[in-house]
Amino acid sequence: IEADKKPASMDDATWASYKTTNLSALYQSLGVISMMSNNPADAKTKFEKAVAASATDPVNYYFLGYIADGEYQVTVKAYQASQPGKQRDDLLTKANTQIDTVIDYYARAVAMAESNPQYHAMGAQVRADLETYYKYRHKSLNGLEELINKYKPLTLKP
């Protein structure tokens, strides 16, 4: 599929749909396996490839956010254990960048989940985490809906 070797019996439109759907699902499955194998770096790569193949699946954005959140938590612990100074300041900067990444992935997950009824329950759960992080980072929820709307498919934008 990655090599784009279309079977001779398949027309271009069918192949494009097949490739998009199945390549994304394959990478998503491999990402889940990597997560279960406690290999978040490999999982991240797989979920990024799944998003590249099909950018509308909220599950991939959720997992990317979950992985980024794990990285953020490690940085926060290091920050809390560090002494005042440049290293601590650098850790705070890194943590802020990481939480922004988590917020971005979760906003994408919520936006995509709202576009597909089968993912509405998942979207509501992710939204709760998103709101917590967004409020912590921005001191309010002002601007959150605009961020989510930015990632909604064109047909769902208000």
Question: Where are the model-predicted features located?
Answer:
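Alpha-helical solenoid repeat scaffolds, predominantly canonical TPR units
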Residues: 34, 46-47, 98, 105
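Short coil/turn linking the two alpha-helices of tandem helical-hairpin repeats
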Residues: 32-38, 65, 70-81, 94, ...
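Canonical positions in the second alpha-helix
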Residues: 49-50, 109
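Terminal, low-structured helical/coil segments at or just beyond the last alpha-helical repeat
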Residues: 6-12, 86-89, 93-96, 108-158
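Short coil/linker segments at helix-helix boundaries
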Residues: 2-21, 70-108, 112
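Residue-level recognition of tetratricopeptide repeat
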Residues: 23, 56-60, 116
